[in-house]
């Protein structure tokens, strides 16, 4: 920047500012400002021409007055005239005034644009920098229309100075954020990608920010940036390289650039090129290794820079979700931060582990830190850290730890910050329902929830507990007994009265045989709460009373007296008065048979998606992550409508889920002839009659298919137009899969038609039913499709998902294999060593055993192997095999027609880098298929 000359001090401006500061009152300040404004007007309108210095001084005074909060309605032309000056300070003040005071509707905008164009064309780097800063500061649509085509040329020009390139990149980024439709993507894109190799730190950092933003909207145009970003990142983090070593910040080389490069890589799936992928893995391993090294400085700047790179690397590992070893290492590293003395680090570790808990590969590793997280919930002083601890407990919850986590959440709820109580209530309700093996525990949990935090229990929660009690015969008597006992407390929350009134009205007869809960006692107990409740609750209790008339004829007279009282028949509330009159008349004139018909027990509710999860998402607020990304990061989307509780030994599912049950499978397996129940209308069969019309499988489809053998959620397919994400869950022979179709472009997809294609053999063995989707998918939007699945018999093939649509007048046709494999219906079974080997010997016929010896395709890591076997669906049996290095598993394949017991044994040979896998089942085809699927994972 040019040196400021002696005359640029502007003493008059300093005196004016001093006068303003010395004013004793608001009136004195306004008087001084008006005096100065009159002086400036006279100077601007005078016959004597002002020199550049005077214009600059007076424009600065006007700018200062404006910043004090006073309107300025003159001086704009003088500021524009300063833009034509060849003196840096005068031009600088002109641009400053324009950036702050001139709006896009000004009559001077054309003159301003001409001055900016002249400076951009001047090739004077200082003037070009001022012009670019002004464009970015104003950032209006008009500025984008005028200069969006010029700035890319400056950015990629070979003779542009580094400082100007940096400003041009940031200016273009600002315009793209303000008006993305006006920034053209053209020939310059390939050249701007190569700025990632620039040796100037400012240029490459600004270019990375620009490319990251552009790649989110136009991934195909910038896909070459992946290899360049990996290469540059490798040169930075590898100690042998000297790239940007001059930009080391507290012993961390170029930390800001490293973070931006890692963020850029999160715009894309894992690299397909093995060399690039291997190099990226080396980079991530190097970053994780450096995190384990002793700190090179005790200063906070060193740890901040080092941890910033580490956390962004962990975000990339989680985003790719394809390297089990890295995921487990990342989890272990974060576990060390959970007890760090720095609060911010503990917060970030908890937040990152929430995401890692959604991966099949790292979920078990996250669960090992449960005691530390529970301790954080109890001892952390910062409420935001405690909230993250709640989120992590919710994310790591599965059947093995659900009761412990729910108990801890309930304990914390009594002292929780009021701002997060409703969210915790919703999470407890979701977890209690999803992982309820014993539904008496579920009832106890919800009633305890109402007792502790009744004011925060929404209607969705107590509606849901009533639905589940009505749908489950085995819990109705217990629920009636429990609510009766709870209502005997001197002070009951109104929500408990609602639940108690409804349940006793339906099932009070189940406990009426006990003298302590006789019909009259039940009525008096409920009526003692009547006058303390709001109108809606009183209306519900009146309905309970008329139900009692049907259930217990002996209390009919007592209830009629209550309904006949003036407080009811002449109630000021119309609803209560109408109910009292109608119920009284009904109890008087209706015969016993009619009364029994009108007031019969409520039928089971249709199984449908619970609204509790939707309530939780609404409570959490809008997310910056797209639903398709959530498909990768979350485990499930809806709440179970009350499935049959499984035996404790076989209740664990292969894919733990912190969110909610996707399966609305009902209280019994669906009737084979009919479709599964649904809240969204009739289901339609989408088996294609013309599979020949489908496109060949998309590149990488087989690899993505193999990745989903041991996982249920993630991104199945992605190209420049379309992203397909999956969320799925299976229980016994039933499953439900949600497919998310995301439009990555800004243009509508028309005639959007997804079709499932199955061979004749597969159709006979696998039942698939789905709902149609909207044929129009807006740009940047996503649509969801649910697929209900039933395994009729064992199968070997997988269905193909074919998507056809029109994009920009062009017909698009994409086919991918849908990862529905036999092991999805694999339920784990715990067995003692003696039982295992006894069963192993029983399955000794040659046709019952399949064995495969194969070379390891991935690093032979014990923890990763365990995670894959559990993800495959088998129980991992500890201390069964005499050789502790071997892995032994057991489970049952559930189909509609049969249940097939399965035993497996995996023997690793570390020296030879080989595995021997043995499968024994009662059916040869099952042994063969499971062996094929599992051997591909190692």
From Swiss-Prot:
InterPro entries: Adaptor_Complx_Large_Subunit, AP2_complex_asu, ARM-like, ARM-type_fold, Clathrin/coatomer_adapt-like_N, Clathrin_a-adaptin_app_sub_C, Clathrin_a/b/g-adaptin_app_Ig, Clathrin_app_Ig-like_sf. Transmembrane segments: none annotated. It comes from the Eukaryota. SUPFAM superfamilies: ARM repeat (SSF48371), Clathrin adaptor appendage domain (SSF49348), Subdomain of clathrin and coatomer appendage domain (SSF55711). Residues 645-668 have a biased composition (Low complexity). It is a peripheral membrane protein. Keywords: Cell membrane, Coated pit, Endocytosis, Lipid-binding, Membrane, Protein transport, Transport. Its main location: membrane. SMART domains: Alpha_adaptinC2. One of its GO terms (molecular function) is protein kinase binding. Residues 616-677 are annotated as: Disordered. A 1,2-diacyl-sn-glycero-3-phospho-(1D-myo-inositol-3,4,5-trisphosphate) binds at residues 11-12, 43, 53, 57-61. One of its GO terms (biological process) is clathrin coat assembly. It holds the Pfam family Alpha_adaptinC2. It is found in: Cell membrane; Membrane, Coated pit. GO terms for cellular component: AP-2 adaptor complex; presynapse. Adaptor protein complex 2 (AP-2) is a heterotetramer composed of two large adaptins (alpha-type subunit AP2A1 or AP2A2 and beta-type subunit AP2B1), a medium adaptin (mu-type subunit AP2M1) and a small adaptin (sigma-type subunit AP2S1). Binds clathrin. Binds EPN1, EPS15, AMPH, SNAP91 and BIN1. Interacts with HIP1. Interacts with DGKD. Interacts with DENND1A, DENND1B and DENND1C. Interacts with FCHO1. Interacts with ATAT1; this interaction is required for efficient alpha-tubulin acetylation by ATAT1. Interacts with KIAA1107. Component of the adaptor protein complex 2 (AP-2). Adaptor protein complexes function in protein transport via transport vesicles in different membrane traffic pathways. Adaptor protein complexes are vesicle coat components and appear to be involved in cargo selection and vesicle formation. AP-2 is involved in clathrin-dependent endocytosis in which cargo proteins are incorporated into vesicles surrounded by clathrin (clathrin-coated vesicles, CCVs) which are destined for fusion with the early endosome. Belongs to the adaptor complexes large subunit family. PANTHER family: ADAPTIN, ALPHA/GAMMA/EPSILON. This is AP-2 complex subunit alpha-2. The lineage of its organism: Eukaryota, Metazoa, Chordata, Craniata, Vertebrata. The gene is AP2A2.
